[in-house]
């Protein structure tokens, strides 16, 4: 395992490439890299270019309303901020939710996880590997044979089915309006799939569109709508009535519960017979594409998720923990309350602290904007052509765990769960690695394969399988508990602020689709005194700190060779593997800031 470079060791010579803007769930991102004469990335700079500011907006508001504000941080991972927020308030006020509410929250959270991962792979990430135009050259009969070889259990596998998909795609291309497929790099040699694999992937792209719109209906049953389903401090905002179908004010009945079960089975079939086989098929063809490990080979963090027994974190299906220095033999405990463990630094962020060599725990966090550019910045304040990363260069703060920059997300969760001995995860990972090695003729070990762009993408698919499988357990437990006579969905004993202490503080944690998510709150006189959120993109998109430690995005891009630097497919592959939501124009710049080309990131 190579050592993790410090910012002071990075080679900042060579050609500078700028990708801007890169739109993500927390705002807009910018990425700059230096490439050497061999087109290998030697320096990477990740910049957050929009200030969220919700922490400031929340001050002085009713903590029972915080979830509705913070939920708007993101419209893709909808609901996860609301869930984390109500957990923070409940922690501060010592509120325990009913068992039904725990199960319903689990179902809503896992629905999000499944939906988000499927949408990510097929509609955000797949086009970094799949060439839809090349699918026009495919033989539908050969595509059918490939589908049956890759996943014989999938029903949609006939030559006629793939011929119909190809015909639809051909009409689309011949219209001259490629839409979401326009501005791609379809002649770039970085694309290696045969036409039949491309056609199969395009068919699954369309199937995933149908699936994603159906599974989120679970949110409308339990949360009233999607996106941004309703939550509440003390439980969930939905009543239960199994006696009268469609009873007013009681959306949870056996008809709606059976509808939920049908959606779970559909997602389970798709994950097992389409999503996972597709990821392994892509990995098998791109078997040498093991770039993008970065921090994953060194430092990983998870708060734990999918708690089976309420308020018992030891029952998390994916456990909490931290790995430092690539030591998988030791998973360290994580305490989000400890001011020595989690701190945010701002020496390279557009914020101001009294002492910028020291970090602040979120309970004591300060959000004071200070936008200033370093002296070597090229361009102007409103049109930056090249950032000066030696100074402040991002609206994202720099969170650290015991001083270390950490990678968070599905890959972190899976490596930590594997190292912690979770049998379900070990079986999944071992099975997948064996399939990869068998299909490629390689003999890679876990540490060679998992800490990579491909490994990060596989971990997300495996987590989708775990989530949808465990949804069946939650559904059965919920129905069983209701039939046993328990109809409670909320604990309102402390709803009235007159029952609250004069001052209180709490923390809510969750594992959002993209990684570790924490909300820290201080309440005084019934109002929010301070609120801080550290989101997954803050961890992964962190700028450097005062000691030169680089973040997950920056580290993952290093040492990647690009086929054509003016068509940065490789940059997008690795950035997308962290599950950013990208649909914006990007620009590739020469060292003097002149635009070379304009592309669309899909």
Curated annotation (Swiss-Prot):
Binds 1 nickel ion per subunit. Pfam families: NiFeSe_Hases. Its cofactor is Ni(2+). InterPro entries: Ni-dep_hyd_lsu (IPR001501), Ni-dep_hyd_lsu_Ni_BS (IPR018194), NiFe-Hase_large (IPR029014), NiFe/NiFeSe_hydrgnase_LSU (IPR050867). Keywords: Cell membrane, Membrane, Metal-binding, Nickel, Oxidoreductase. GO terms for molecular function: ferredoxin hydrogenase activity; hydrogenase (acceptor) activity; nickel cation binding. Its EC number is 1.12.99.6. It catalyses: H2 + A = AH2. It is found in: Cell membrane. It is a peripheral membrane protein. SUPFAM superfamilies: HydB/Nqo4-like (SSF56762). PROSITE patterns: NI_HGENASE_L_1, NI_HGENASE_L_2. 15 or 16 residues are removed from the C-terminus during maturation of the protein. Ni(2+) binds at residues 74, 77, 581, 584. PANTHER family: HYDROGENASE-2 LARGE CHAIN, UPTAKE HYDROGENASE LARGE SUBUNIT. Heterodimer of a large and a small subunit. This enzyme recycles the H(2) produced by nitrogenase to increase the production of ATP and to protect nitrogenase against inhibition or damage by O(2) under carbon- or phosphate-limited conditions. Belongs to the [NiFe]/[NiFeSe] hydrogenase large subunit family. This is Uptake hydrogenase large subunit. It comes from Azotobacter vinelandii. The gene is hoxG.
């Amino acid at each position: 395992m190579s050592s993790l470079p410090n910012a002071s060791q990075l080679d900042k010579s060579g050609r500078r490439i700028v990708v801007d803007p890169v739109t993500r769930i927390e705002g807009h991102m910018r990425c700059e890299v230096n490439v050497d004469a061999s087109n290998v990335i030697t320096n990477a700079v990740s910049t957050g270019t929009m200030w969220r500011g919700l922490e400031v907006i929340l001050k002085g508001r009713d903590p029972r309303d915080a979830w509705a504000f913070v939920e708007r941080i993101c419209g893709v991972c909808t609901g996860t901020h609301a869930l984390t927020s109500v957990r923070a308030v409940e922690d501060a006020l010592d509120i325990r939710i009913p068992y039904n509410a725990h199960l319903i929250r689990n179902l809503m959270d896992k629905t999000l996880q499944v939906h988000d991962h499927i949408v990510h792979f097929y509609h955000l990430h797949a086009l970094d590997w799949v060439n839809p135009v090349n699918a026009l050259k495919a033989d539908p009969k050969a595509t059918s044979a490939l589908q049956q070889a890759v996943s014989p259990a999938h029903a949609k596998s006939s030559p006629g089915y793939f011929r119909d998909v190809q015909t639809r795609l051909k009409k689309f291309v011949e219209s001259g309006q490629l839409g979401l497929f326009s501005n791609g790099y379809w002649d770039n040699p970085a694309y290696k799939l045969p036409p039949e694999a491309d056609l199969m992937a395009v068919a699954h792209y369309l199937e995933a569109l149908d699936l994603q719109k159906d599974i989120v209906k679970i949110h409308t049953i339990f949360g009233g709508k999607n996106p941004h389903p309703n939550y509440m401090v003390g439980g969930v905002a939905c009543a239960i009535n199994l006696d009268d179908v469609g009873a007013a004010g009681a959306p949870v009945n056996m008809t709606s519960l059976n509808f939920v079960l049908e959606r779970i089975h559909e997602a389970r079939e798709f994950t097992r017979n389409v999503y996972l086989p597709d990821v392994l098929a892509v990995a098998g063809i791109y078997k040498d594409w093991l770039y993008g490990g970065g921090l994953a080979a060194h430092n990983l963090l998870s708060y734990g998720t999918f708690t089976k027994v309420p308020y018992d974190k030891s029952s998390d299906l994916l456990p909490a923990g931290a790995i430092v220095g690539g030591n998988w033999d030791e998973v360290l405990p994580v305490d989000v309350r400890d001011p020595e463990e989690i701190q945010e630094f701002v020496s390279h962020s557009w914020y101001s602290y009294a002492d910028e060599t020291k970090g602040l725990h979120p309970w004591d966090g300060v959000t004071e904007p200070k936008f200033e550019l370093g002296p070597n910045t090229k361009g102007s304040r409103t049109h930056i052509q090249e950032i000066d990363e030696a100074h402040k260069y991002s609206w994202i703060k720099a969170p650290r765990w015991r001083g270390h920059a950490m990678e968070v997300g599905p890959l972190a969760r899976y490596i930590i769960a594997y190292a912690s001995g979770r049998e379900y995860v070990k079986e999944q990972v071992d099975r997948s690695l064996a399939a990869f090695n068998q299909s490629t003729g390689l003999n890679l070990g876990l540490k060679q394969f998992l800490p990579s762009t491909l490994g990060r993408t596989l971990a997300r698919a495996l987590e989708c399988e775990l989530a949808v499988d465990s949804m069946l357990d939650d559904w059965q437990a919920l129905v069983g508990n209701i039939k046993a006579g328990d109809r409670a969905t909320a604990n309102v004993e402390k709803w009235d602020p007159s029952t609250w202490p004069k001052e209180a503080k709490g923390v809510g944690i969750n594992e959002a689709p993209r990684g570790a998510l924490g909300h820290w709150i201080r309440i005084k006189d019934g109002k929010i005194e301070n609120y801080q959120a550290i989101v997954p993109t803050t961890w992964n998109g962190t700028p450097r700190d005062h000691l030169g430690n680089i973040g997950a995005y920056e580290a993952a891009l290093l040492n990647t060779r690009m086929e054509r630097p003016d068509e940065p497919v490789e940059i997008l592959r690795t950035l997308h593997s962290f599950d950013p939501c990208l649909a914006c124009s990007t620009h590739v710049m020469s060292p003097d800031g002149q635009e070379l080309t304009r592309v669309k990131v899909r």
